[in-house]
């Protein structure tokens, strides 16, 4: 009985060894199949640790994909599906293309902003010119008004002065005539005509030079 049990144990151990070796071979075959199925794209680079890393043109790593599967690990999720027919088109967009697109978009916005700025500057220039012309017109009108007022005041002042002078001279002339008349009556001599008057107190004799 003991010998039979030992033989059964030996058979079981041999079966276990064979099953483990078979499992290892199956795992190695699965790994080989997985490695043979994966196609490296231009933006993917293989690593030394049994995986592949997606890289852009600048060399910066973006995503990593492990190609060795284990029994406990979930299936590999394909990050980029590459079609065999159109192998030239890459599904991984590089940072240079993104930066180019972004720069072009910014350039368009800047151009539009420049156009708007030029349009608004033209409008502001027109408004400033119109305001300047209006200010110049108003200033010229104000100057003309001031000049006309000054002329009017000057003319009024001059006319008043002339009238006063005329009145003054008229009064003075009248006074002078009155005085001359009094002198003529007193001295019986006409000073305006430069000849003596008859019938007075004084007798005038003409002297020859």
UniProtKB/Swiss-Prot annotation:
InterPro entries: CDI_dom, CDI_dom_sf, KRP. Induction: Down-regulated by auxin in roots. Keywords: Cell cycle, Nucleus, Phosphoprotein, Protein kinase inhibitor. Phosphorylated. It is found in: Nucleus, Nucleoplasm. GO terms for biological process: DNA endoreduplication; negative regulation of cyclin-dependent protein serine/threonine kinase activity. The keyword Cell cycle applies. GO terms for cellular component: nucleoplasm. Binds and inhibits CYCD2-1/CDKA-1 complex kinase activity. Regulates cell division which is crucial for plant growth, development and morphogenesis. May regulate early lateral root initiation by blocking the G1/S phase transition. Controls the mitosis-to-endocycle transition and the onset of the endoreduplication cycle during leaf development through inhibition of mitotic CDKA-1 kinase complexes. Specifically targets CDKA-1. Belongs to the CDI family. ICK/KRP subfamily. This is Cyclin-dependent kinase inhibitor 2. The lineage of its organism: Eukaryota, Viridiplantae, Streptophyta, Embryophyta, Tracheophyta.
């Amino acid at each position: 009985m003991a010998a039979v049990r030992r033989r059964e144990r030996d058979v079981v151990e041999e079966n276990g060894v064979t099953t483990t070796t078979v499992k290892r071979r199956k795992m190695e075959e699965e790994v080989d199949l997985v490695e043979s199925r994966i196609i490296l794209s231009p933006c993917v680079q293989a690593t030394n640790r049994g995986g592949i890393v997606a890289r852009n043109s600048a060399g910066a790593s973006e995503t990593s994909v492990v190609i060795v599967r284990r029994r406990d690990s979930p299936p590999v999720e394909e990050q980029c599906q590459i079609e065999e027919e159109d192998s030239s088109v890459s599904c991984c967009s590089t940072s240079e293309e993104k930066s180019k697109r972004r720069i072009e978009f910014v350039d368009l916005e800047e151009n539009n902003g420049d156009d708007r700025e030029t349009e608004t500057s033209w409008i502001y220039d027109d408004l400033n010119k119109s305001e300047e012309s209006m200010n110049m017109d108003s200033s010229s009108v104000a100057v003309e008004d001031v000049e006309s007022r000054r002329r009017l005041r000057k003319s009024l002042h001059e006319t008043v002065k002339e009238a006063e002078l005329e009145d003054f001279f008229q009064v003075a002339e009248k006074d002078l005539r009155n005085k001359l008349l009094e002198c003529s009556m007193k001295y019986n001599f006409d000073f305006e005509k430069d000849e003596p008057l008859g019938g007075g107190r004084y007798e005038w004799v003409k002297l020859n030079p």
